């Protein structure tokens, strides 16, 4: 768990972090970073490739990327197989969201490559724009909370997900398929998105990304700001998207326990570098990962 001490509260006072787990000790963000760096080990390319099932569907090699002239990711590698899920965890400022931003085209890439597609169908998408990555490469980015258009109806929000389609009728057709899939949204199709509950808004955000029928979902903090019952609902939806609909998922998740329980593969980032990589359940059982990121 990453919780900062506040005010004059004694360091031994029990506290509850964002994982809803009690802990007898509070570790500052600075200490998490320091201790995580001590745990960091050089993760070889053989380890990275071994965790991906079959030919990698998403492959990042030697990526140096950031914002403006500031480099956040340093020689970063990643591989995930088709229909697999990968969760990125780590201290604040480790570069987790920057990985998603880089895949989707929101960063400056100084060197390295990003490819999508398996085997002979692999395509270099490093220099494509976000619109090209959505329309041509089948990559959708599901932003953090509060990305719906509150004054628009649920139905209109879904139509917006198809803004790159050649014909508006195609977006409307896809919206109807989504309403059939998620009756909870269908019941609210004519209501302003601003009146939805937190869980319903997240469902709408995910559904809007599905309008373009992407192959790869980049999911940024799916549990942030949600009550526990809605968190479970969102991860059930993501589970079905992976295992029933065949989507490949790369996510950043502040609730490291929930993210590692969900994902096939887990990566720990520290200071813009890959510090640890293993199967999600293996990292979940790692006592050092538990101490720093899972609340004990």
Where would I find each of the regions flagged by the language model?
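Helical segment within the ABC ATPase nucleotide-binding domain
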Residues: 231-246
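ABC ATPase C-loop
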Residues: 209-210
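The feature captures the beta-strand-to-loop junction immediately N-terminal to the Walker
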Residues: 89-91
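ABC ATPase NBD Q-loop/coupling interface
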Residues: 113-134
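ABC-family P-loop ATPase nucleotide-binding domain
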Residues: 1-64
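Helix-to-loop junction immediately C-terminal to a conserved catalytic motif
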Residues: 104
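ABC-type ATPase nucleotide-binding domains, specifically the catalytic core motifs of the NBD
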Residues: 50, 68, 108, 154-173, ...
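Conserved ABC ATPase signature
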Residues: 192-196
